[in-house]
């Protein structure tokens, strides 16, 4: 497993995230509708909207997964925020970043991943 690097804009990114005051807030229908729609549109069992804090990935909304947060070290989203576009992992077992990641080897046993960084 390769832990995600820290993006060059980390200080500004974290400041913008905290300014939103969204971390650790209760579920909201407006976000849940987005994740449910994504699950249906892409025909995938799991969809979530995650925010990457300094040491964790926190799921604001999710469907098909009971996870509320994970360490940033094992997060797929930690890798996604390193770029500006869509990140696709077609088979996590064959990707050097993820093949031995506990999110891949243990439940939820992620195989396919597609993510896009959120920007404020």
Could you tell me what each predicted segment is?
Residues 1-29:
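Signal-transmission linkers at sensory-effector interfaces
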Residues 2-3, 26-30, 37-39, 66-68, ...:
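A short linear-motif detector with a strong N-terminal bias
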Residues 15-16, 45-46, 52-62, 67-114:
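Regulatory sensory and allosteric helical modules in signal-transduction proteins
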Residues 24-57:
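Helix-loop-beta substructure at the N-terminus of cytosolic sensory domains
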Residues 118-120:
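Sensor-regulatory modules in signal-transduction proteins
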């Amino acid at each position: 497993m390769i832990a995600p690097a820290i993006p060059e804009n980390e200080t500004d990114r974290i400041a913008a995230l905290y300014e939103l005051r969204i971390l650790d807030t209760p579920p909201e229908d407006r976000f849940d509708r987005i994740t449910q729609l994504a699950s249906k549109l892409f025909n995938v069992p799991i969809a979530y909207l995650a925010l990457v804090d300094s040491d964790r990935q926190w799921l604001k909304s999710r469907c098909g997964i009971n996870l509320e947060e994970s360490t940033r070290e094992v997060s797929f989203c930690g890798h996604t925020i390193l770029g500006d576009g869509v990140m696709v992992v077609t088979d996590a077992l064959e990707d050097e970043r993820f093949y031995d990641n506990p999110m891949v080897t243990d439940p939820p046993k992620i195989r396919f991943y597609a993510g896009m960084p959120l920007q404020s």
